[in-house]
Structures are given as C-alpha cells and as structure tokens.
Amino acid sequence: MAADKQAKLSLQEDSIAKMLICKAHIGTKNVEHKMRPYVFKSTSEGIHLINLAKTWEKILMAARVIVAIENPADVLVISARPYGSRAVLKFSQYVGAQAIAGRWTPGMLTNQITQKFMEPRLLIVTDPRTDAQAVRESAYANVPVIALCDTDSPLEHVDICIPCNNKGKESIALMYWLLAREVLYLRGELPSRSVPWDVMVDMFLWRDPEEFERKERLEDEEAAPHTAQADATQWGADAAAADWKQAGADWTGPAAGGAGGEWDQSAVAAEGEWGGGRPGVAVGEPW
C-alpha cells in the first residue's frame, strides 16, 4: 500500500524531461544558507543545480494547500517580474485565483483605506526578492506565502518554497503549469497525472509584444516587393503602347513656318509677341 502511494507521488519521466528542457534545475552562483538543502551539486563554473525531486515534493505540498482553501478567489498570485506576468494570469484563469501582473501597490494588504485593499488567505509569489514588498505585507497580515525560490532567494516570511529557476521565462511557465495541473487533479477535474493535460505549457509562456511587431514588420516588408512586382506585370507592352497612342492622339503641333524657316509678323503676334519682347531681335527677322 505504501509502495503504491509512493509510486503515485513519485516524479514522472515526462515531468523530469520538461523540467530539464525548461532549465528549471539551473540555479545561480550564490546560495542562501536556507536554500542549501535543495542544492544537488555545483558545476565546474560554480553554478549550483537544484534537486528536481525536492522541487516536485514542494509542488505537491503547495497544491494541497491551495486545494484546502474553499474559495479559489481567496488565493492571490502575483508577479512583478515581466517573465511571470502571463504565467500568473493563466494560472488564475484555470485555477480560479486572483492575479496581479506588474507592479505591486504598497498597502494592498495592510492599508484598509485604499480602494485596492485585499484580504487573501494565501499568497503565491514568483520571486521573493522582486516581490519583497508583498511578502513583507503578508507577514503583517498573517497570510501564508508560497514562493518560487532560486538558490539565492531569501526565505524570510516564506512558508513553502518551490526550489526552481525563477529567472527564466520557460522555467516560470512550467512551474505554474505543473502547479495548476496538480491543483486540478486534486480537485478531481483531471482523471490522472498520467493523462496528458490538453493545455500546453506554451500557453503559460511569456511572449515579447515587440517581437510580434518586429515579425509583422518583416512580413510586410517581404510582401511589399511581391505586390509591386505583381502590379508591374499588369502593364504589358500592348497596354503601354495603346496608352501612349491614346494620350498623343489629341496633340497637334504648332503651325509650320515658311519654307525658309522664317517667321512672319502675323504668326508672331498670334503666338503672344514672340521676339517683340526680346531686345535686338526685329519682328520678321529669321532666328
């Protein structure tokens, strides 16, 4: 019986592969003394690697805490780091929690006069260092905190830390995806952990809006020469000749002069006093 429970809670190969691909195990060169138990080993370059088995254990523990809260809206997920903004929004969408992506307004948990005052029962932060203001206010309001912690993250006022790489956009997206999947499984909305979830990890991945604009601009620039070439091919040789012929059909040249090429006075007067206004040129003289 105990072996079956251990097998159900054990880390699956698919989840391990996802963590390795998203580089969730790569830490930093600095290690907080409270984060040392979660470090597996360090590379020759001095980068500490995180034990993914303990990461999975903390994800299971955090999911059980989230499920224990009756109202999902009492769970607040925040991320001041831009890479985690899309992940927290997607997590709140599938789990039903509240999300704040962006700058944290001071006093949201402590100042009751503000319009944005909130009273959550659980706080989930992407980085306890960048979200330090929210973690500090949660300690004043007696709100438990779940945090994605790197090897150099401070664990002060953090109740449950999920050791992972909280600086990469792929790792942050995967951590929230795994946490959301586990919450839905414990609620009974997913039949089993082995059954693939129809929501992909890419839905939680942060995308740069400037990159989309850059791609659209390049696509427009590539399509512009083809459009100009297509318009140019519509004008064939026959169409151009017909157009020139039609444009020159109504044109008539000026009245021809005499055989000797001389201009008479009447012709000059009809043309608007040609030669009369020029000094040194007599009317009727040849040019």
UniProtKB/Swiss-Prot annotation:
Belongs to the universal ribosomal protein uS2 family. InterPro entries: Ribosomal_uS2, Ribosomal_uS2_CS, Ribosomal_uS2_euk, Ribosomal_uS2_euk/arc, Ribosomal_uS2_flav_dom_sf. GO terms for molecular function: structural constituent of ribosome. Residues 227-243 have a biased composition (Low complexity). Required for the assembly and/or stability of the 40S ribosomal subunit. Required for the processing of the 20S rRNA-precursor to mature 18S rRNA in a late step of the maturation of 40S ribosomal subunits. It holds the Pfam family Ribosomal_S2. GO terms for biological process: ribosomal small subunit assembly; translation. This is Small ribosomal subunit protein uS2. CDD domains: RPS2 (cd01425). It is found in: Cytoplasm. It comes from Toxoplasma gondii. Keywords: Cytoplasm, Ribonucleoprotein, Ribosomal protein.
